[in-house]
């Protein structure tokens, strides 16, 4: 048999207290009577009652004494026992949890296909998935701009450009500088990812240096430092320095404090070490002095910056567009050089040949020449607009112009502007007199090459307005305007051998002398009749357009034969023949006269 373990003291005490708290009950007594005499007394428990009574009394007293002692201890250590019990319970719980985790871990180790997942403690933050980029992770352009900013801030050891400048530091700064900039603001913009390209970062850097050179005088430390930083910064951020891996653009590694200049770089610098050291430890007084080589590099950096800004502006306003200029090649061909190329860092310039194949479409099958066909949408009709129609109808020279009449005006004056100008000039001198009208007509004839007079004659012929042909009108005007017209007519009398019958010229001088007042009325009536006949003839001829086949037309009518067919036989003494139809001057000379000649 195994060894019997004793109960724990606390458990024994609790069981004893439970037993002591129970009230003691007296056993029942049984009295048996046999034949009227008492026999024996049996207790319900089967023990002696006297012995039980003595023992119960003794235990009761002992229990009372222990109870008194326990009350004293409980009053003193009651609060201590509660805390100890709580601590013990917590420690037991922790031990149980550890043992439970260890047992589960050992059981899971035997299962190779099952993954062990251990929950991290609640105070540690939950890690994000590595495949997803973190929110605070910087982009490549941000890393590049942060590197540039660190390099630029190292060139400002005193921190002049580290923070924004206020009016308390520099009086009147806000009145002079409208767009302030500093390294702190640039850093905030880098963190906020407001720079979309290096060009914008360079623009803010140049703005900061320009503000310092604008506010400060050239002999101040701030001006010299700003100019020095501007030159070094643009040189560092130039494309050539980035491609060659210059010492300023290479990422610097931490070096011992004893060495003032970094020696190890990603690539070897083209400059000797002495020149680099002299540049970095150059005194502030000589910061403004630039040699020819450094000045050229500075100008080159500024030109590259301006070119980058222009390229970005073009790409922003015309995305995908190609702007450039024409240049002639060595062999004489034309090339179109593109400025805003898709790859600005490309070594070769983007060019396109300019020839007929690039300007015209392909030759269609069956055609031997490249024809040009203008689209209907490109055709401009001047009469389609309401403004043109109103402006043409409201003129006082020609009212209610028709489409064919407008075509005549356009053929004479060229375009709408020319028509309006001609009509405006004629309307201006409408009531000014014949001399002003003649001056305007001569001016328009000189401009249009004589088309003005021919157009007016055709228009008035269509409207049945009597008017001399332009050639005859000019001849008549020149003869009427000359002061020596009578002498010229008289001088023609000395030429009897001419083919024209000039016998009527001898009677021109006698007309005014021999006319009586009574005969003047008769002459006026005849002149009126002749004018009416002329008007009817012009209306008859002007109403119909001449046909293209003039050779197949019939002979002249009887009326035309009456006016044009009969030769004039004027004598010196016949006065009434002067008032005949003026068309008689257009007839051909008689055959007899020609025979004489």
UniProtKB/Swiss-Prot annotation:
Localization per Swiss-Prot or TrEMBL: Nucleus
Biased composition (Basic and acidic residues): 11-25, 50-62, 74-85, 111-126
Biased composition (Basic residues): 1-10, 63-73, 86-97
An example molecular function term from Gene Ontology annotations: nucleic acid binding
Residues of the Bromo domain: 136-240
PANTHER family reported for this sequence: BROMODOMAIN CONTAINING PROTEIN, BROMODOMAIN-CONTAINING PROTEIN 9
Protein name: Bromodomain-containing protein 9
Species of provenance: Homo sapiens
């Amino acid at each position: 048999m195994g060894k019997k373990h004793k109960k724990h003291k606390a458990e024994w005490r609790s069981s004893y207290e439970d037993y002591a708290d129970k009230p003691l009950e007296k056993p029942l007594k049984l009295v048996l009577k046999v034949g009227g005499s008492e026999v024996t007394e049996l207790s319900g428990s089967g023990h002696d009652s006297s012995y039980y009574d003595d023992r119960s009394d003794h235990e009761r007293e002992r229990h009372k004494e222990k109870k008194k002692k326990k009350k004293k201890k409980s009053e003193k250590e009651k609060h201590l026992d509660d805390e100890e019990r709580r601590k013990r319970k917590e420690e037991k719980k922790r031990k149980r949890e550890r043992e439970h985790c260890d047992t589960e871990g050992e059981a899971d180790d035997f299962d190779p296909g099952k993954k062990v997942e251990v929950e991290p403690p609640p105070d540690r933050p939950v890690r994000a998935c590595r495949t997803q980029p973190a929110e605070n992770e910087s982009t490549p352009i941000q890393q590049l701009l942060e590197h540039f900013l660190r390099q630029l801030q190292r060139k400002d050891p005193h921190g002049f450009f580290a923070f924004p400048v206020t009016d308390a530091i520099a009086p009147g700064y806000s009145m002079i500088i409208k767009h302030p900039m500093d390294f702190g603001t640039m850093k905030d913009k880098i963190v906020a990812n407001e720079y979309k390209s290096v060009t914008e970062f360079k623009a803010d850097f140049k703005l900061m240096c320009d503000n310092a050179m604008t506010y400060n005088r050239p002999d101040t430390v701030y001006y010299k430092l700003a100019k020095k930083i501007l030159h070094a910064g643009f040189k560092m951020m130039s494309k050539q320095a980035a491609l060659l891996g210059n010492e300023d653009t290479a990422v610097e590694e931490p070096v011992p404090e004893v060495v003032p200049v970094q020696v190890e770089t990603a690539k070897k610098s083209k400059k000797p070490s002495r020149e680099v050291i002299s540049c970095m430890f150059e005194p502030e007084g000589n910061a403004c002095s630039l040699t020819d080589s450094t000045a050229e590099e500075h100008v080159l950096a500024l030109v590259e910056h301006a070119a980058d800004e222009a390229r970005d502006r073009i790409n922003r306003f015309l995305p995908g567009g190609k702007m450039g200029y024409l240049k002639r090649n060595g062999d004489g061909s034309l090339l179109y050089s593109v400025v805003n190329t898709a790859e600005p860092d490309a070594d070769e310039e983007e060019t396109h040949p300019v020839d007929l194949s690039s300007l015209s479409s392909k030759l269609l099958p069956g055609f031997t020449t490249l024809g040009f066909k203008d689209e209907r949408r490109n055709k401009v009709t001047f009469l389609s607009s309401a403004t043109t129609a109103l402006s043409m109808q409201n003129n006082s020279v020609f009212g209610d112009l028709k489409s064919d009449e407008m075509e005549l005006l356009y053929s004479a004056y060229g375009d709408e502007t020319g028509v309006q100008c001609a009509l405006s000039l004629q309307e201006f001198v409408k009531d000014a007199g014949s001399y002003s009208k003649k001056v305007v007509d001569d001016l328009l004839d000189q401009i249009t090459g004589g088309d003005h007079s021919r157009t007016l004659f055709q228009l008035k012929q269509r409207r049945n307005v009597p008017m001399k042909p332009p050639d005859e009108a000019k001849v008549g005007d020149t003869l009427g305007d000359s002061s020596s017209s009578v002498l010229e007519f008289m001088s023609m009398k000395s030429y009897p051998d001419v083919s024209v019958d000039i016998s009527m010229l001898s009677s021109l001088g006698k007309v005014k002398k021999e006319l009586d007042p009574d005969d003047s009325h008769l002459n006026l009536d005849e002149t009126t009749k002749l004018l009416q006949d002329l008007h009817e003839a012009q209306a008859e001829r002007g109403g119909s357009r001449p046909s293209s086949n003039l050779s197949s037309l019939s002979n002249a009518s009887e009326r035309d034969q009456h006016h044009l067919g009969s030769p004039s036989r004027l004598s010196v003494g016949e006065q009434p023949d002067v008032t005949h139809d003026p068309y008689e001057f257009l007839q051909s000379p008689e055959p007899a006269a020609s025979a004489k000649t």
